[in-house]
Amino acid sequence: MNETIVCVVGNVATRPVYRELASGASARFRLAVTSRYWDREKSEWKDGHTNFFTVWANRALATNVGASLSVGDPVVVQGRLKVRTEAREGQNWTSADIDALAVGHDLSRGTSAFRRPSAKDGEAGVSPAARPEPNWETEPGSQPSVEHQPQPEPAGVT
C-alpha cells in the first residue's frame, strides 16, 4: 500500500534482456538518468550526476519492452522503486531497481510509431479492423448556412 512510485526520464543503457519464465515473460534493462543544470558563468547546460536503475518489466509489458527498446533510446519509466542491499563476496552492494508499470519513448526528444501486438503475437484479443483516417478538412464554400445551424436555447426562463 505504501509504495514509492517514481517517474524517471533517461536513456536505455543496456540492451533489454527478455526471458520466458514459468511465471510469464520478464525483461530487464539498465536506465541512465543524468541531471542537467544551467551554468550561469558559462551560459550553458552542464551534465550533473548520472544515476543508474535496473528496470524490470513483466508479462505483456516485458514482451513490448523487448520488442521496442534499443540502447540509447530516450524513455520515460513509471514504476515502484525498490532499493535492495545484498552481500556479494564479502562486500555490500546496493541497487536501485524499478518494477515498471509503464515504459514509453520520450516524445520530447524524438518520434515513435505505436503498433498494437497482433493475436499471433500472444495477445488474447484480436485488434479491431483498421479504419481510414477521417478527413478533418472542410471544403471551401461547404459551410452550412446560418439558418440550418441549431440556435442556442435560453438557459432558463424566469
UniProtKB/Swiss-Prot annotation:
Region (Disordered): 109-158
Domain of life where this protein originates: Bacteria
InterPro entries assigned to the protein according to its UniProt record, in alphabetical order: NA-bd_OB-fold, Primosome_PriB/ssb, ssDNA-bd
PROSITE patterns: SSB
GO molecular function: single-stranded DNA binding
Record's keyword terms, sorted: DNA-binding
CDD domains: SSB_OBF
GO biological process, one term: DNA replication
Start and end residues of each SSB domain: 1-107
Quaternary structure and interacting proteins, as annotated: Homotetramer.
Cited HAMAP family: SSB
Protein name per Swiss-Prot or TrEMBL: Single-stranded DNA-binding protein 2
Lineage start: Bacteria, Bacillati, Actinomycetota, Actinomycetes, Kitasatosporales
